[in-house]
């Protein structure tokens, strides 16, 4: 799957939520996420623009690989994710294989949805508030159309496309 994603920093969560609802987004759920990232054995993922993580989402665990970003505008990239039963054993496996653990990213995420576009408001420990718009696609040829839709949503929220952040939360933390 390819995840088309854009992220912007926000100041007023309530204002953004109100605007999202006016655009037809519906609240889905609120959850806590802790992401434990690992750096590569044979390459530095910061240099190759890849990511490998274990996510704890309210007690549900996932391993995710993210490939390099595929454009200069967004955070669009290949994403492969699998649910796992035991995050600690997976963590041990990665360490035994030589992967280096990076300090975790913790956030409270509120998810809103309109059709197949998800809007997440993240309150990230040590970084503040962000809005992420994302949609999973299987055909790369859909990417530009999806990005156009997302740009229209930003415009309706009075957020300039110049405010788009391509850096991950790890990069924003300087890790």
Curated annotation (Swiss-Prot):
Where is this protein found?
Cytoplasm
Q: Which residues form the signal peptide?
A: none
Q: Which UniProt keywords apply?
A: ATP-binding, cAMP biosynthesis, Cytoplasm, Lyase, Nucleotide-binding
Q: Report the principal subcellular site.
A: cytoplasm
Cite the InterPro entries for this sequence: Adenylyl_cyclase_CyaB, CYTH-like_dom_sf, CYTH_domain
Record's GO cellular component terms: cytoplasm
As recorded in UniProt, its EC number(s) are 4.6.1.1
Which residues of this protein are catalytic?
A: 37
Pfam families assigned: CYTH
Looking up SUPFAM superfamilies in the UniProt record yields:
CYTH-like phosphatases (SSF55154)
UniProt function note: Could catalyze the biosynthesis of cyclic AMP (cAMP) from ATP.
> Into which family does the record put it?
Belongs to the adenylyl cyclase CyaB family.
Report the protein name in the record: Putative adenylate cyclase MJ0240
């Amino acid at each position: 799957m390819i995840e088309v994603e854009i992220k912007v920093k926000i100041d007023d969560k309530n204002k953004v939520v109100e605007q999202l609802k006016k655009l037809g987004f519906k609240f889905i759920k609120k959850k806590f996420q802790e992401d434990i990232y690992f750096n590569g054995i044979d390459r530095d993922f910061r240099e190759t623009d890849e990511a490998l993580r274990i996510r704890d989402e309210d007690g549900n665990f996932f391993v995710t690989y993210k490939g390099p970003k595929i454009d200069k505008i967004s955070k669009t990239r290949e994403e492969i994710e699998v649910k796992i039963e035991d995050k600690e054993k997976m963590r041990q496996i990665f360490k035994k294989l030589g992967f280096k653990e990076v300090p975790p990213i913790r956030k409270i995420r509120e998810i809103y949805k309109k059709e197949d576009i998800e809007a997440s408001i993240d309150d990230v420990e040590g970084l503040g508030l962000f809005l992420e718009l994302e949609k999973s696609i299987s055909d790369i040829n859909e990417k530009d159309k999806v990005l156009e839709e997302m740009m229209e949503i930003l415009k309706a929220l009075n957020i300039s496309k110049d405010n788009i952040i391509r850096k991950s939360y790890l990069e924003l933390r300087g890790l």
